[in-house]
Curated annotation (Swiss-Prot):
Protein name: Adenosylcobinamide-GDP ribazoletransferase
Biological pathway: Cofactor biosynthesis; adenosylcobalamin biosynthesis; adenosylcobalamin from cob(II)yrinate a,c-diamide: step 7/7
GO cellular component: plasma membrane
Organism of derivation: Pseudomonas putida (strain ATCC 47054 / DSM 6125 / CFBP 8728 / NCIMB 11950 / KT2440)
Alphabetized InterPro entries for the sequence: CobS
Name of the top EC class for this enzyme: transferase
Length: 240
């Protein structure tokens, strides 16, 4: 179970202690458990939504979104902000884009992107709360983290060194394919057209990454997760 705890420590703000530095092989295997971490997030959000029944819809949605951000420690929002700054400021140049991504400062494009994404997610949750949100809360966190597994499976990792390279090099590819298949079938059963929308957004974002960078980085993987979660909740709110 060590790979699961590695995944949970990396993807969440939950207090997880590991017994020492994990081997690269265990780090690579942790990718297989990313969807399970997403499912855990979805279950916690579902439970919170159940406990918040009777709360005014705007407050209900705001508290759900706050819990959602806190569970991940805003890790992927940081990747989204860095990617937004780099994509606009990179002017189509690969090296400039990668260099801006490493800059810890956030520019106005990053701030505007974060505000818009959080605003849209809040509005979508507000609609879903009004409709009697249920098991659909499982979908977005699960799809977002399964997409990270899919991205590392089919996309080169372009920034040498660090955790991302260990994930990409030591991921058990055959097992990853089976995990993704199970996730897709489960999500299609639960979410229908919203899942197809997420797949389309995944393909489009991956195309943009490959065209600009020749692959992915940790920041663009985080941005992918956030944008796919947004696509799913928007699709559900629109009745897809």
């Amino acid at each position: 179970m060590l790979p699961f705890w590695i995944a949970l420590q990396f993807l969440s703000s939950l207090p997880v202690s590991l017994p020492g530095m994990p081997a690269p092989r265990e780090v690579g295997r942790s990718l297989l458990y990313y969807p399970l971490v997403g499912l855990l997030f979805g279950l916690l959000l579902w439970l919170a939504s159940h406990l918040l029944q009777g709360t005014p819809s705007p407050l209900h949605a705001a508290l759900l979104l706050t819990l959602w951000v806190l569970l991940s420690g805003a890790l992927h929002l940081d990747g989204l902000a860095d990617s937004a700054d780099a994509w606009l400021g990179g002017f189509g140049d690969r090296e400039r884009t990668l260099r801006i991504m490493k800059d810890p400062r956030s520019g106005p494009i990053a701030v505007v992107t974060l505000v818009l994404v959080l605003l849209l997610k809040f509005c979508a949750l507000w609609v879903l709360v009004g409709q009697g949100i249920g098991a659909q809360l499982l979908l977005a966190p699960l799809i977002g983290r399964a997409a990270m597994l899919g991205l590392f499976l089919c996309t080169p990792y372009v920034r040498p060194g660090g955790l991302g390279q260990a994930l990409a090099e030591h991921m058990p590819r055959r097992a990853a394919g089976w995990v993704l298949l199970v996730c897709v079938l489960f999500c299609l059963f639960l979410g229908g057209w919203s899942v197809l929308l997420a797949l389309a957004v995944f393909a489009w974002l991956r195309h943009l990454m490959c065209r600009r960078l020749g692959g992915t980085t940790g920041d663009t993987a985080g941005a992918l997760l956030e944008l796919l979660e947004l696509a799913v909740v928007l699709g559900l709110a629109l009745g897809l």
